[in-house]
Amino acid sequence: MLLVRKWLHTCFKYWIYFLPVVTLLLPLVCYPFLSISQKIYGYFVFTTISSLGWFFALRRRENQLKTAAVQLLQTKIRKLTENNEGLRQIRESLKEHQQESAQLQIQSQKLKNSLFHLQGLLVKTKGEGQKLETLLLHRTEENRCLKMQVDSLIQECGEKTEEVQTLNRELAETLAYQQALNDEYQATFSEQRNMLDKRQIYIGKLENKVQDLMYEIRNLLQLESDIAENIPSQESNAVTGNISLQLSSELKKIAFKAENIEAASSLTASRYLHTDTSVHNYSLECRQLFDSLREENLGMLFVYARQSQRAVFANALFKTWTGYCAEDFLKFGSDIVISGGKQWMEDLHSSREECSGRLVIKTKSRGHLPFRYCLMALNKGPLCYHVLGVLYPLHKEVLQS
C-alpha cells in the first residue's frame, strides 16, 4: 500500500511530462500504419506539438521550483524570526506594511476607478458644454437676426405711423372742406325749399281757383241738362248728339287733368322734401288722381288697363245706378250688356284715341236701360296706356235717383 501511494505521488508530481512523452511516442506507434507523405507531415506536426509541450513543461517546472524556493525561504525566515525577537517584530512590521500597502493599493485602485469615472463625466460634461456653447452661439445668432427684424419692423411702424398721421391730416382737411360744402348746400337747399314752399302755396291757390271753375262748369252743365229734359221727344236725336259732345268735352278735361297731374306735382316741393322711391311716388300720384276722379259726377267714370284687362278705378255710380260693379261690364261675353257689347269691347281695346257709342244695360232695379259711353286713351302721366271712360244714362229717372 505504501508503494502504491508513493507511486501515485510520483505520478501526480511529474504529470506535466506525460503530454510531451505521449507526443513523441505516438508517431513511433503509428509509424507502420502511415504513408510516406503522412509520415513526413506527421513527424513535422508531432515534433512541433512536442516542442510546445516540452516548453510548457519546462515553464511549469520552473514556476514550481520558484514557488518551492519562495516557500523554503519563507520557512527559513519564519524559523529564524521565531528564535529572534527583533526579527519577529521586523517580520510583523513588514506584514503590517504589506497589509497597509495592500489596503493602499485597494484604495488607490478605487481612486483610480473614481478618477476614470470622473474623467468620463468630465469628458461627457465637456461634450455637453460644447453642445451648449454651440446652442448658445446658434441662439445668439437667432437673437441677432430677430433684433434686426424687430428694428426693421419698428422703423417700418414709424414710417406707417407718419403716413397715418399725414392721411389723418388730409382726411381732416377733406372733411372740413366737405363740411363747408355741406353747409353751403344746406343753405342753398333751405333757400330752394322756401322758394318751393311759396310755389306750392301759389299752386294750391291756383288749384282752388280751378276747382271753383270746375264747380261752376258742372253747375252750368247741370242747368243745360235740366233744359234738355224739357225739350220735346221729337228733338231726342239732337239731344243725344249734344250729350255725346258734352261727354267728350268733359272727358277731355278730366283726361287732361289725369295726364298732367305728374307735371303739377313736379312744380311742388313734395319731391324735394321727401326721399321716397319711384314706386312710392307712382302710387302716391295714382292715389291723388283717383281721389280727384271720385269727386267727378259726370257719370259712371272708370279707368281700364288694356294689358291686364281689368278696371283699376271705378266710381260709386256703377253700384248706385246699375247694382253691379265695373268688372262685370268689362268681361267678355257678359250678360249684363244686352245690346252693343261687341262694339263696346272693340272700342275698349281699340288703338283710337277717342271712341263713343250706345249700350243697353240690364240693371237690378230698373230693368234694361240705355247708356251713352265715351272712351279716351291716356298717352302720358301715371296712367299712361290706360283708357279713361264714362257711361252716362239717357233716362231722367236714373239721374234723379
Swiss-Prot record:
Cysteines joined through disulfide linkages: none
Transmembrane segment boundaries: none
Superkingdom in the source lineage: Bacteria
InterPro entries the record matches: UPF0242_N (IPR009623), UPF0242_PAS (IPR040578)
Similarity section: Belongs to the UPF0242 family.
Name this polypeptide is given: UPF0242 protein CPn_0755/CP_1117/CPj0755/CpB0783
Biological source species: Chlamydia pneumoniae
